[in-house]
């Protein structure tokens, strides 16, 4: 097991090989303690071995690593000098650049390949890693040692790791856990880590990027980074940890160390290489930003993240953009590059959640971001790790809701499998389909977008559309643009952190339709995954916008939020504020999608419910229910017409807020445009305009119409029942039996068939067409004719059942006359 000594890093599995033509042992021999310097360079072969003990990072190394991280301001500087001085010092800088600029070290070709070929590594052993330790370490060490036997894909991975190390050092140079950035990519080889750290230090000092952000956890490997804000705990990567520690110490503390001028002189001696590195890094960053919109990697055993986690990610991105210094504009997109390429498994155990929360709190505390740091720390206690996520293929199949600003979200919102709720309130979510009082058939029709059969009037049809819209978000045909409001939620989060309001204050995070009041007395915090999820946002916003124009026109939205958290009447106005988040463009687009007939009905219905807005509501429910009711406190049964009251009463009174919310789709959209013009003075300053809702609404209306237009089942053609078919009452299957029964029935004999010689069993088909038609009816073959029946009669010739009487047409004879034949006098006809 490798351990960190006070003076240098010692590893037992090394053999003193040269790294890229640079003998680290001879450079470090100048230090006072040269014990074990030949062991600084681990073998390249051991890097790709999954059973290497260096790669199995256990809990026993965490104490020594954390203690080394705590010595950052003290004796750790001496450890830094041991490694960084030979890598970046004045004596060996030419040697290092010579090793970089050799012809066989084709970094330009590697970077160009990386810019054109997208590298995706599927994790095999550890689900918490994006790029596994084995892959990256073996490839990076092989590139340094000029190993030509490795494949081109591995070379691309090594360039990926080199560029990511550079970007990581720039992105994470402002916090105490910054040394985890270079260790985040899991290099098991100290040689590969040293080269990556040297390249990162060169790029970082040349650009003089001194930005501070608090995002190193998004770049952490997850395999060994369990020390809360301490030193890097990656396996065998202590050399890179020391280099990163030195670099972070110089950048974070702002104190120039002795080796910083040597970086600059080394760069001045080799300007061409530095220029290549800079241009390629920038090209890769631009290319990755383009590729991020179309790439859907497959990560094993991953679920959709919490919406709060994605909001936290957007908050991190905005913090980075705000804290970029002016001289760091060259690498302004480096942190975004790491955001895009980072994924983590969100199936976290409670122990991992606790560790990551402690780690994030330590990082936010050490970042020193002023007043926002306290809000971040308070917010971390409510949410798990903020992880940038791309829409994974697994999420497309499993149906988790994704709100990512980089992608359109082609996922469906199912209420069956949610990730663990970040609120940790112990209140379980309730499926909206199971909370209503409607019959099962109506629920199924509502899920399919079909109106119930009982909707006779236009108002009843509106209630049916409400139920359909309430349950449509559980289906699989939702339009990709339905899940919006990401930028609005990120701005909302910034305001929340300044006033200390948690994210689930707004209810469901993507819709802006939640009405819970976490600060109220006796009200448990509702989970962020509400049943009134995604389609209710346009409905809720238009309804509240129309009410805003009539009731709270003089209020300012921020002023409302700060004063209305203690009384039940004020909680209703908080619900209105959550509904005000939609812009006028969306309201007008929603208004254009509704028919003129619905608009006339809605204008009549809009006049009564608003007068009761600030008074007691007969159907408003307290907010201590397991799920919130953003609309139940605002709309009475008079909102829906009297004909639909019976259909909607059971739903509203049973606290299914999704149905009540969707009912306002037809009840409030007509007055939305006029109310928007009237409420211009109280326009919310939080929500910006997002993409159009008209496209989404037309999609949903087309979906509902398509579900209604089902083809009718074709009816079976009725058979002509010219005669009664008594022959079907028995179990007759053969034609000769059928003819024998006809001969014994007075209805058919002698009308269609008759005996010519009863003793000999000779009979004649009087009406061959009628007999064949009767036989076809018996066999359920309406196209039966005499030719077809005649072939069956000829078949009986060979069987010895019937015989053809010569010289007479349509005359046949039974070979063996049955004795139990009913005697019918047919000779008189």
Swiss-Prot record:
Residues 214-223, 308-324, 353-364, 374-383, 423-437, 558-617 have a biased composition (Low complexity). The keyword Repeat does not apply. Residues 214-237, 301-329, 353-383, 396-443, 508-533, 558-641 are annotated as: Disordered. One of its GO terms (molecular function) is sequence-specific DNA binding. Induction: The expression of this protein is developmentally regulated and is correlated with the 20-OH-ecdysone induced activity of puff 74EF. It is found in: Nucleus. GO terms for biological process: autophagic cell death; autophagy; cell differentiation; oogenesis; positive regulation of transcription by RNA polymerase II; regulation of development, heterochronic; regulation of transcription by RNA polymerase II. This is Ecdysone-induced protein 74EF isoform A. It comes from Drosophila melanogaster. The gene is Eip74EF.
